[in-house]
């Protein structure tokens, strides 16, 4: 989120919270008497804390370092379009001398469906 979007969101939140405080607990037209009796008054601590916490979280979100474009770019690691030079080389049974030769002698071709 860039600074312009965050500023616009902040402005909208401030306008919405100001309108809700100006209207009071009953809304624009006074609301129902049932709700007015249940909610005998506004909760000033909770109402004052909510916009403040929203502003604080928005400011912290703006100050957080974003992920670098290099993190978002994750090329296909295997197959075509790889950046390594090893992709052009072919593996051979003798290429890995670290592996013992009995391993390659045990590897037999599989014959599926033929008897």
From Swiss-Prot:
Region (Disordered): 20-51, 78-102
Any one GO MF annotation of this record: neuropeptide hormone activity
Keywords associated with the record: Amidation, Cleavage on pair of basic residues, Neuropeptide, Secreted, Signal
Functional note: Morphine modulating peptides. Have wide-ranging physiologic effects, including the modulation of morphine-induced analgesia, elevation of arterial blood pressure, and increased somatostatin secretion from the pancreas. The neuropeptide FF potentiates and sensitizes ASIC3 cation channel.
Protein known as: Pro-FMRFamide-related neuropeptide FF
Modified residues (Phenylalanine amide): 78, 112
Signal peptide coordinates: 1-22
Top-rank taxon, per record: Eukaryota
Gene Ontology CC terms, in alphabetical order: axon terminus; dendrite; extracellular space; perikaryon; postsynapse
Cellular localisation: Secreted
Pfam families in the cross-refs: NPFF
GO biological process terms held by the UniProt record: excitatory postsynaptic potential; neuropeptide signaling pathway
């Amino acid at each position: 989120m860039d600074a312009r979007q965050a500023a616009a969101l902040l402005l909208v939140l401030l306008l919405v919270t100001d309108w809700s405080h100006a209207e009071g607990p009953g809304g624009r037209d006074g609301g129902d008497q049932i709700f007015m009796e249940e909610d005998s008054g506004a909760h000033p601590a909770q109402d004052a804390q909510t916009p403040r916490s929203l502003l604080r979280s928005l400011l912290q979100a703006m100050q957080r370092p974003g992920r670098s474009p290099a993190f978002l770019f994750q090329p296909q690691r295997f197959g075509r379009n790889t950046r390594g030079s090893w992709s052009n080389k072919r593996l051979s049974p003798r290429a890995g001398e670290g592996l013992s030769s009995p391993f390659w002698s045990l590897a037999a071709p599989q014959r599926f469906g033929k008897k």
